[in-house]
Structure formats: structure tokens, C-alpha cells
């Protein structure tokens, strides 16, 4: 699963997801893409689940690009711990995804296979997605 080698700080604020994605909303590498239509946090496990679906569905053909990276740690307190005594330890990593952000890109496979594979990968995401095709 994806995670940063090192970060400036161990724990981060939750933050807010306002507006649309400014960057990463256009197809750059491949021909087909999976685009988020809602704001959410996508965990490194969910990114990996989508990647597995795509690589298995296209078998040996095609190239895949993952356009998001989980760089934000999410902390969790131990179950049954009382209030107070600081923030919990980092539990997992998430990528902050705004509407319009491209999650995956594909190239080198047929229209039918790419569309079907990206649609299945979209079911693994915690957000509504749409498949973008080349013009």
C-alpha cells in the first residue's frame, strides 16, 4: 500500500474540502481516466483495491497511472480510551480528493476493456466516479 517515506509532521489537522480540484483534473498520461465527482478521503487500501482490479482486468495489456497519493495521516484513539490525554496515534493514510480529480489513467487497451475496468474500479471507491474517454 502507498504511504510517504517521511513527512514534515507526524500528525495533521483534518481540514476542509471546499470547492473543486484545481490541479489533476485533466487527462495527462493515458487515454481513459476515472474521475471523482464528490469530495472525500480515499485511503491507501482503497487505492490499492482499485489498482488490483485494473491490473487483473486488463491482464498483461495496457499501462496504468495512479494520479493520487495518500499523504495525510489519519489518527485513531484506542477503543475504550477515555476523553482527553491528547490526539491518537497515526493509523492509516488518506489522499484528499476533491470533485473533478482524476484517480486512475489507462492506456494501451481497447475502449470496451478500459471502460469496463475503470467502472469496476469505481465501485471500490468511497465516492461517485465517472469514466472519461479520449475526445
Swiss-Prot record:
SUPFAM superfamilies: Ribosomal protein L16p/L10e (SSF54686)
Protein origin, superkingdom: Eukaryota
Entry keyword NAD: no
Keyword rRNA-binding in annotation: no
Gene3D superfamilies linked: Ribosomal protein L10e/L16 (3.90.1170.10)
Entry's Gene Ontology molecular function annotations: rRNA binding; structural constituent of ribosome
Key words of the record: Chloroplast, Plastid, Ribonucleoprotein, Ribosomal protein
A GO CC term attached to the entry: chloroplast
InterPro entries: Ribosomal_uL16, Ribosomal_uL16_bact-type, Ribosomal_uL16_CS, Ribosomal_uL16_dom, Ribosomal_uL16_sf
Any Pfam family hit: Ribosomal_L16
Gene Ontology BP terms: mitochondrial translation
Record's subcellular location: Plastid, Chloroplast
Family: Belongs to the universal ribosomal protein uL16 family.
Listed HAMAP family: Ribosomal_uL16
NCBIfam families: rplP_bact (TIGR01164)
Oligomeric and partner information: Part of the 50S ribosomal subunit.
Name the record gives this protein: Large ribosomal subunit protein uL16c
Organism: Stigeoclonium helveticum
Gene this protein is translated from: rpl16
Amino acid at each position: 500500500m502507498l504511504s510517504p517515506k517521511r513527512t514534515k509532521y507526524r500528525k495533521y489537522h483534518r481540514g476542509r474540502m471546499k470547492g473543486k480540484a484545481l490541479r489533476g483534473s485533466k487527462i495527462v498520461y493515458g487515454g481513459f481516466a476515472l474521475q471523482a465527482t464528490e469530495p472525500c478521503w480515499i485511503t491507501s487500501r482503497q487505492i490499492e483495491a482499485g489498482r488490483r482490479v485494473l491490473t487483473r482486468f486488463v491482464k498483461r495489456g495496457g499501462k496504468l497511472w495512479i494520479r493520487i497519493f495518500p499523504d495525510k495521516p489519519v489518527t485513531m484513539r484506542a477503543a475504550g480510551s477515555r476523553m482527553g490525554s491528547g490526539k491518537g496515534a497515526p493509523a492509516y493514510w488518506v489522499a484528499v480528493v476533491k470533485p473533478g480529480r482524476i484517480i486512475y489513467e489507462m492506456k494501451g487497451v481497447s475502449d470496451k476493456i478500459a471502460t469496463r475496468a475503470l467502472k469496476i474500479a469505481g465501485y471500490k471507491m468511497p465516492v461517485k466516479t465517472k469514466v472519461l474517454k479520449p475526445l
